């Protein structure tokens, strides 16, 4: 299935490319997240000394970005393609350019530029040295070397690539409206567009995010998720020799708190002062999850580097 003819073909091509370069092709995380970085395969696995290579698609939700389906390229629900390689290989940029060529954007035929743009996620306590990747004047992906995640230094440094799939697909298909994207690669009566799949949901979720979400309920959900995250970590910390700290269930609650915060923000019920307070509360949960992860086997607690 040719990547320039369908949205699903673009995804399949990226899957095949990164699988051939040693990445485990994972599935999307089954929770509401604001970006592919929130997937534990990135947030948690970027920590600790253990090598890690993974790629996956992640549905992402940013409630404030909804436009009731009336904007041709702005969505409250969209898809990111995420690649994380730890330690970051010296040829990561070449691998990225190879992926562009695989999906039909030959770097020798297009103006591909890397524009310095360091990345930060305040709620995750994460930042990295990064670049926006522009093709013929349009941003198509982000290229980051993680320095810190969950407030913890990344050692070794992990390399992350994030592709905005809708924007990339619009470029390779040559369409100006995201809802006109060919989704399945067929034509005529069998053709399915991005709008056929997602337009109604985009309209309805915009109404919910901006007009209908019960703010009192959301506030309580945030408190509940915060308490549950800390309670899980406390319960999982019993026993000094335990390498199972219940990090993943706790991190799920951190993700829930983050999404609820984003919904409250979209509803316009968070002041400037409160906003910073909520961000710090989510960041504190992420930090606790990251610290607990490093005390587990998956986090590299008993891992020995070569030569040690």
From Swiss-Prot:
GO terms for molecular function: ATP binding; glycine-tRNA ligase activity. Keywords: Aminoacyl-tRNA synthetase, ATP-binding, Cytoplasm, Ligase, Nucleotide-binding, Protein biosynthesis. CDD domains: GlyRS_alpha_core (cd00733). It is an enzyme of class 6 (ligase). GO terms for cellular component: cytosol. Its main location: cytoplasm. It is found in: Cytoplasm. It catalyses: tRNA(Gly) + glycine + ATP = glycyl-tRNA(Gly) + AMP + diphosphate. GO terms for biological process: glycyl-tRNA aminoacylation. Its EC number is 6.1.1.14. PROSITE patterns: AA_TRNA_LIGASE_II_GLYAB. Pfam families: tRNA-synt_2e. It comes from the Bacteria. Tetramer of two alpha and two beta subunits. PANTHER family: GLYCINE--TRNA LIGASE, CHLOROPLASTIC_MITOCHONDRIAL 2, GLYCYL-TRNA SYNTHETASE. Belongs to the class-II aminoacyl-tRNA synthetase family. This is Glycine--tRNA ligase alpha subunit. It comes from Brucella canis (strain ATCC 23365 / NCTC 10854 / RM-666).
